[in-house]
C-alpha cells in the first residue's frame, strides 16, 4: 500500500492523522501542508463511509481512530457523534469524494506548500 511517510515513524504518523482527522470532523475545514492534506483525504473518506454505514461495528471502528474531543460546547456533542449524526447523513447520496483539497501557496516561514482541506 502506498502512503506518504510525512517524515515520521509509523506511530507518530498515525497520531498525526488521528489528530488532523478529528480536527477536520469538528471544524469541517483546516489548513495544513499539501502532503498532509492529501494523506488525510483518504483517512477522512473512510471515516465518513463508516459514518454512512451507521451500525454498531462501524461506530466502534470510528471510535477506535477518532479522538474523543468535544465538537460542540453547547450540546456536549463529541467528534464521533458529529460524524454519525451530522456529517454522514449529508453525504447519503454521494459515493465518495467527500473532501476537497485547495492549494493556497507556500508557508511564510519555510516555504512549505500549504493547502486547505474541507468537507464538500
Swiss-Prot record:
UniProt subunit comment: Part of the 50S ribosomal subunit. Contacts protein L32.
- Whether Cytoplasm counts among this entry's keywords is no
| Residues in coiled coil | none
Q: What is this protein called?
A: Large ribosomal subunit protein bL17
Question: Which GO cellular component terms, listed alphabetically, does the Swiss-Prot or TrEMBL entry include?
Answer: cytosolic large ribosomal subunit
Asked if the keyword Iron belongs to this entry, the reply reads: no
Which family, according to the similarity comment?
A: Belongs to the bacterial ribosomal protein bL17 family.
Checking InterPro entries in the record gives: Ribosomal_bL17 (IPR000456), Ribosomal_bL17_CS (IPR047859), Ribosomal_bL17_sf (IPR036373)
Pfam families assigned to the protein according to its UniProt record, in alphabetical order: Ribosomal_L17
Q: Which PANTHER family match?
A: LARGE RIBOSOMAL SUBUNIT PROTEIN BL17M, RIBOSOMAL PROTEIN L17
| Molecular function via GO | structural constituent of ribosome
The record's keywords, sorted A to Z, are: Ribonucleoprotein, Ribosomal protein
Instruction: Tell me which positions the record assigns to the signal sequence.
Output: none
Q: Fetch the Gene3D superfamilies from UniProt.
A: Ribosomal protein L17
- Kindly list the biological process annotations in GO that this record carries: translation
